[in-house]
């Protein structure tokens, strides 16, 4: 296995009892204690919120938090037992580490990484802007995905007008700048990636149009374990 690019703090194992109101999850820890954890994922979590599944949670020592525990990952049994990242706050953090370590050769050489840079007519903020002396600026937008069909990762898993907007704004940068859509595949069992046509056909068609116009798509595979996260390289793009 590749080296960890990110290491979790000590986690606690448990069993998912239920997820409700989007932000809450009742979990029975191995000790038998039942806790309510914060669910840091507002999406539908298609296929990754089944009661009875094994989960891992982190615990905060911040006395001001209403919920001390955060649900970090869940184990699914789709094609093989696989840990799937639940915490949508992590992909951008991990991507920042990957970019700083220059682990994605497809992005070429760059000297500086800027974060949350305003751009576009629709007033977005791009996740990362890569610059270098001998290259045009490269705008990188990150999207995390956990939805799969077999070993095919899919995004989005629901209609996303915000995601559609991001594609339009990245397209508007071309060809004067480089534009990249980086899909953070938050599980290690997928070897291909495709747009989630059945969930959002408008997004899927926009992505195909953008690729034809020069948008670079990087479906990045990550292995998730209770110890940490490692980068596995690119999945094959299926358009």
UniProtKB/Swiss-Prot annotation:
Gene Ontology terms for molecular function: DNA binding
Top-level taxon: Bacteria
Pfam assignment, any one: SfsA_N
Record InterPro entries: SfsA, SfsA_C, SfsA_N
Stretches of the chain forming a coiled coil according to its record: none
CDD domains given in the database record: SfsA-like_bacterial (cd22359)
Family: Belongs to the SfsA family.
PANTHER family in UniProt: SUGAR FERMENTATION STIMULATION PROTEIN A
Protein name in the entry: Sugar fermentation stimulation protein homolog
Lineage: Bacteria, Bacillati, Cyanobacteriota, Cyanophyceae, Gomontiellales
């Amino acid at each position: 296995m590749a080296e960890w690019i990110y290491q979790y703090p000590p986690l606690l194992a448990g069993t998912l009892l239920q997820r409700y109101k989007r932000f809450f999850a009742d979990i029975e820890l191995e000790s038998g204690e039942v806790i309510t954890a914060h669910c840091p994922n507002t999406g539908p979590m298609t296929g990754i919120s089944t009661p009875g599944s094994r989960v891992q949670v982190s615990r905060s020592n911040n006395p001001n938090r209403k919920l001390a525990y955060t649900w970090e990952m869940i184990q699914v049994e789709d094609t093989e037992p696989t840990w799937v990242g639940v915490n949508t706050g992590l992909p951008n953090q991990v991507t920042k580490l990957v970019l700083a370590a220059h682990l994605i050769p497809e992005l070429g050489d760059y000297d500086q990484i800027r974060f949350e840079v305003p751009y576009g007519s629709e007033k977005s903020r791009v996740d990362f802007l890569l610059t270098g002396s001998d290259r045009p600026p490269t705008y990188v937008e990150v999207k995390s995905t956990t939805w799969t069909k077999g070993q095919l990762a899919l995004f989005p898993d629901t209609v996303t007008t915000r995601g559609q907007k991001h594609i339009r704004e990245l397209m508007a940068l071309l060809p004067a700048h480089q534009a990249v859509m980086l899909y953070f595949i938050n599980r290690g069992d997928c070897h291909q990636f495709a747009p989630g046509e059945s969930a959002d056909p408008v997004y899927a068609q926009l992505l195909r149009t953008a690729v034809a116009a020069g948008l670079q798509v990087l479906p990045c595979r990550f292995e998730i374990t209770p110890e940490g996260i490692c980068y596995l390289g690119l999945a094959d793009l299926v358009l």
